[in-house]
């Protein structure tokens, strides 16, 4: 117990009484967007277009308890690397002065990898608790320990995370215009 207790900081605001720890920090936040669109007028009746959008983001924070992690001001304790791609192609074709055909096809993909601040660190020996963690780096890290109403240690249970989400969409329309437009 004393090895775990050594990871908890002393109170930083004695005026508020025992157990009050406050800290400020700025989370990591770096987002880059790249967008482009191309229009091609195949003829006076047919317009074809395509667009590309890519966002890369590195977002994260550092836990206030150091190696014991805990909460991270403005973020979760760790680092997330995300890429979102959004691509689409479409067209509009004037078949007659009163009949228009249009359509669009879209694709969206999100790749995300999030690792906690303590990812891969083995605390079994440091804390003297055999059996915590395992051979896989995803099983390691500081254990989640809560003491009363205080903020606990470790990273949120959903970390680490690796995911790829993709979606496709398409829509096609034929419009008939009646009368003056």
Where are the predicted features?
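Short acidic-glycine motifs
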Residues: 1-181
């Amino acid at each position: 117990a004393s090895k775990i207790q050594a990871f908890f900081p002393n109170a930083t605001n004695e005026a508020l009484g025992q157990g009050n720890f406050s800290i400020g920090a700025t989370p990591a936040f770096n987002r880059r967007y790249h967008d482009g669109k191309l229009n091609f007028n195949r003829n006076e009746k047919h317009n074809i277009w395509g667009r590309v959008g890519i966002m890369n983001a590195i977002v994260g924070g550092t836990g206030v308890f150091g190696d014991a992690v805990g909460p991270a001001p403005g973020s979760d304790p760790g680092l997330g690397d995300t890429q979102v791609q959004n691509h689409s192609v479409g067209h509009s074709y004037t078949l007659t002065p009163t009949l228009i055909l249009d359509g669009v096809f879209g694709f969206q993909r999100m790749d995300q990898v999030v690792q906690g601040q303590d990812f891969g660190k083995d605390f079994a020996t440091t804390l003297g608790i055999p059996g915590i963690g395992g051979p896989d780096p995803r099983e390691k890290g500081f254990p989640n320990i809560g003491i009363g109403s205080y903020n606990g240690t470790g990273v949120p249970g959903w970390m680490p995370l690796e995911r790829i989400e993709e979606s496709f969409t398409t829509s096609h329309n034929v419009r008939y215009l009646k009368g003056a437009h």
